[in-house]
Amino acid sequence: MPNLSSVPDEAHTEPRPAESATPKRRKSRKVSNPTSPPIPAEAADTLPDWPEFIRNSSPGDVERRFAKEAAAILASEPVVANNYACVALLQPERSIGQFELDQIFAALAKSNPDSAKDVLLLLLSPGGGIEPAYQISKVCKTSAKDKFVVCIPRQAKSAATLIALGADEIHMSLLGHLGPIDPQVQGLPALGVSQALETLAVLVERHPGSANMFATYLQNSVRIEQIGYYERICESAVQYAERLLSSKSALPKPAAEIARELVHEYKDHGFVIDLAEAMEHLGDTWIKVATPEVMAAERLYRLFERVNLFLGFYKSKVLWIAGSVSEGIFIFDRPKTRGA
């Protein structure tokens, strides 16, 4: 599957929970502290700060407390609480795939079955697969009453940018940013093949005596069908982006031009398309800043980062959200880094 992610290959696999290879919610009775009771609602004000709580609690207890505090953050902002069915993809180290698509679909089917509310997607992701990202965007739009809103507190790169292109509004914090949507194949840019061939052609033209050497190298390194495949998946990314953009009004440029720029213009897959550049590409009527949605997302992001900091330090685990902010919380063993 063509991938738009810049995360390491190890993070492209399905998540590995601390006790099972199958992604599923942790249950406190299966962890090392089976006697930990559920957190009483009336004890919320007496709970210790997160570092101490994480050090002494089971993953199930951490999930429950995080879910309660996250729900309180969203409920405290009337614009968010009253107008939106909220879902989230907060996964800074994992690629978007079928699992994420299924989680978003299930959460919206449960929380907004009759499309009575608009949809707000809180998005933090390095990217992932083209196809599931496109489908997530379409599912969110179809499930919304009137509008689908994406809120980006930090990075929404690559395939996450593709998701955002299908939104009616993109709300960004000052540190929020998008990224190019050029596909990656085994961690390398698909566009790099044709660009490498062009570079070799220029070198041969300058140094005709090197032609046989380069011809032998290419014969042993690249198959003709690979070149065609890489070209086609790049054009596929353009098509997906153009389809999501085509329904938008008041774009500063034609949808096809914007889509092509996002695939072909940038030389580095990790390039930061910040707030100002996003407005230049997409228009300042589409990009929103300093909104109640952004304020709620910032508060949730700070909670998310704080919990993950101490989960990693004390437990070597990571918390992700995929789908419902209250029920789509998962704690896994932290993925090993390269060379570890």
Predicted segments with their positions:
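N-terminal organellar transit peptides
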Residues: 1-149, 171, 184-340
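Active-site-proximal glycine-rich helix-loop-beta segment
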Residues: 160-169, 174, 282-283
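Fold-independent oxyanion-binding glycine-rich loops
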Residues: 91-92, 167, 175, 181
